[in-house]
From Swiss-Prot:
Motif (TOS motif): 116-120
GO molecular function, one term: eukaryotic initiation factor 4E binding
Domain text: The TOS motif mediates interaction with RPTOR, leading to promote phosphorylation by mTORC1 complex. Intrinsically disordered protein that undergoes folding upon phosphorylation. Hypophosphorylated form interacts strongly with EIF4E using (1) the YXXXXLPhi motif, that undergoes a disorder-to-helix transition upon binding and (2) the secondary EIF4E binding sites (residues 78-82). Phosphorylation at Thr-37 and Thr-46 induces folding of region encompassing residues from Pro-18 to Arg-62 of into a four-stranded beta-domain that sequesters the helical YXXXXLPhi motif into a buried beta-strand, blocking accessibility to EIF4E.
Deamidated asparagine: modified positions: N99, N102
Modified residues (Phosphothreonine): T37, T46, T70
GO cellular component: neuronal ribonucleoprotein granule; nucleus; postsynapse
Subcellular location: Cytoplasm; Nucleus
Name listed for the protein in its UniProt record: Eukaryotic translation initiation factor 4E-binding protein 2
Native source species: Mus musculus
Tissues showing expression: Enriched in brain.
UniProt PTM comment: Phosphorylation at Thr-37, Thr-46, Ser-65, Thr-70 and Ser-83 is mediated by MTOR and corresponds to the hyperphosphorylated form: it abolishes binding to EIF4E by inducing folding of intrinsically disordered regions. First phosphorylated at Thr-37 and Thr-46 by MTOR, inducing folding of region encompassing residues from Pro-18 to Arg-62 of into a four-stranded beta-domain that sequesters the helical YXXXXLPhi motif into a partly buried beta-strand, blocking accessibility to EIF4E. Deamidated at Asn-99 and Asn-102 to aspartate (Asp) in brain. Deamidation promotes interaction with RPTOR, subsequent phosphorylation by mTORC1 and increased translation, leading to impair kinetics of excitatory synaptic transmission. Deamidation takes place during postnatal development, when the PI3K-Akt-mTOR signaling is reduced, suggesting it acts as a compensatory mechanism to promote translation despite attenuated PI3K-Akt-mTOR signaling in neuron development.
Phosphoserine PTM positions: S65, S83
Length: 120
């Protein structure tokens, strides 16, 4: 049977999560861990459950700041990703090698030779 002795069951009162909007004046005030909503709003949650919603205008202004334009330190050297100059040099060498191979193939092409033999 039921643990309640015939008493009526009342639903608990729901409460909204307390929120506050903070206008940030310095990028150092942003926490390391933050969340996003499906709409793209950034927010973080305090240990007490309060959501801190970050102002979109401030974040968009910070997009063009010198710190946002500076790559992180200690990145690995990945040609074409972290070092664009290396990719350009490598692609020039590769194009020259392909041109040399194509010229070499044209000089030695005698006829239509089969690539392999196959017994049928």
């Amino acid at each position: 049977m039921s643990a309640s002795a015939g008493g009526s069951h009342q639903p608990s009162q729901s409460r909204a999560i307390p929120t506050r909007t903070v206008a940030i004046s310095d990028a150092a005030q942003l926490p390391q861990d933050y969340c996003t909503t499906p709409g793209g709003t950034l927010f973080s949650t305090t240990p007490g459950g309060t959501r801190i919603i970050y102002d979109r205008k401030f974040l968009l202004d910070r997009r063009n700041s010198p710190m946002a334009q500076t790559p992180p330190c200690h990145l690995p050297n990945i040609p074409g990703v972290t070092s664009p100059g290396a990719l350009i040099e490598d692609s020039k060498v590769e194009v020259n090698n392909l041109n040399n191979l194509n010229n070499h193939d044209r000089k030695h092409a005698v006829g239509d030779e089969a690539q392999f033999e196959m017994d049928i």
